[in-house]
């Protein structure tokens, strides 16, 4: 990257359909750390690991574009619950009885919680619960019309990012 030496792509193991692990791709928006330990920490607002151009591509969701490769590989869908890190899947599966419901479908590049503005760091259990409830509703009420609505709302948020975008 121009402002931060290191690989162009960020790769991380995430939980996919049925909990099967896959490697998610993103444009790297944070400083590269050789240890990889920082990669396991969730990005936060004003994160010192993010460099200037990285903040820009995150705000406008440009860092997510490589996930279309994941869609072509069959690991992800355009719309679905966003995939979490495998470690988070394990913890959430213990805390939320119905958590595995969100893994009945492929994870999405965008999802119901993201187009509702619930993106970014998880700052409270209530926010996490709200995201999961939206994912459960999506899985139980899937339709092509619902996917089209989510894609349209996501497109609007890419053009006019919400306050939660950083």
Roles of regions detected by a PLM:
Residues 10-11, 79-81, 86-87, 124-127, ...:
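Short, hydrophobic secondary-structure boundary micro-motifs
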Residues 96-166:
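C-terminal terminal-structure detector
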Residues 5-7, 17, 55, 75, ...:
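Gly/Ser/Thr-rich helix-start
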Residues 43-106, 150-158:
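A short, structured surface patch at a secondary-structure boundary
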Residues 1-33, 70, 144-166:
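A hydrophobic, helix-centered structural microdomain
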Residues 8-49, 110-133:
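Short, glycine-rich, amphipathic interfacial segments at transmembrane boundaries or analogous
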């Amino acid at each position: 990257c121009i402002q931060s030496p290191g690989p162009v792509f960020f790769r991380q193991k995430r939980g996919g359909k049925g909990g099967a692990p896959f490697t998610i791709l993103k444009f790297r928006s944070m400083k590269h750390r050789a240890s990889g330990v920082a990669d396991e920490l969730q990005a936060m607002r004003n994160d010192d690991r993010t460099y200037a151009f990285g903040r820009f591509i995150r705000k406008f969701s440009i860092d997510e574009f490589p996930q279309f490769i994941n869609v072509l590989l069959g690991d992800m869908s355009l719309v679905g619950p966003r995939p979490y890190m495998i470690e988070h899947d394990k913890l959430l599966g213990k805390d939320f009885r119905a958590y595995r419901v969100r893994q009945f479908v492929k994870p999405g590049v965008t999802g119901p919680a993201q187009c509702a503005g619930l993106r970014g760091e998880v700052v409270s259990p209530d926010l996490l619960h709200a995201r999961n409830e939206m994912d459960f509703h999506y899985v139980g009420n899937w339709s092509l019309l619902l996917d089209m609505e989510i894609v349209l709302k996501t497109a609007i948020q890419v053009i006019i990012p919400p306050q939660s975008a950083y």
